[in-house]
Amino acid sequence: LSAEAIRAALKGLNITDLGDLKDVAPDVLLKEMLIEYIKFSFAFRYEEKIRMKRNPEETERLLEKMDKYISNELHNNLKLEDIKTMDFGHLQASEVVKRSLEDAYKVFELFYGEA
């Protein structure tokens, strides 16, 4: 998941080679990596559960909507202080990650029913 999150964050920031990194603030890169990690984690944790009650096309559509929700929510509400205290070597144990995944799943249940 971490490698996928890094790749997606670099793509989202239009970083195609190492030279591009000098134009991106470290906190911006870390925030993007964290957001992508949470998006991938949500899909990893819940895709199979969602797919049990829905067809593959609907599952993909719902996961795309949740990706957008997670991205918007974290871009608007994730604070630099939250990122500075995180151990990026153990993201799965992070309170920010746990809380974000729990909140996203609650929103999913509210709008789309139990997975």
Segments from the language model and where they lie:
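Long amphipathic alpha-helical segments with strong coiled-coil/leucine-zipper propensity
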Residues: L1-L34
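Short runs of predominantly hydrophobic/aromatic residues within well-ordered alpha helices
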Residues: S2, P26-I35, K39, L63, ...
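Short alpha-helix boundary/capping elements
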Residues: I6-N14, L34-F42, Y46, I70, ...
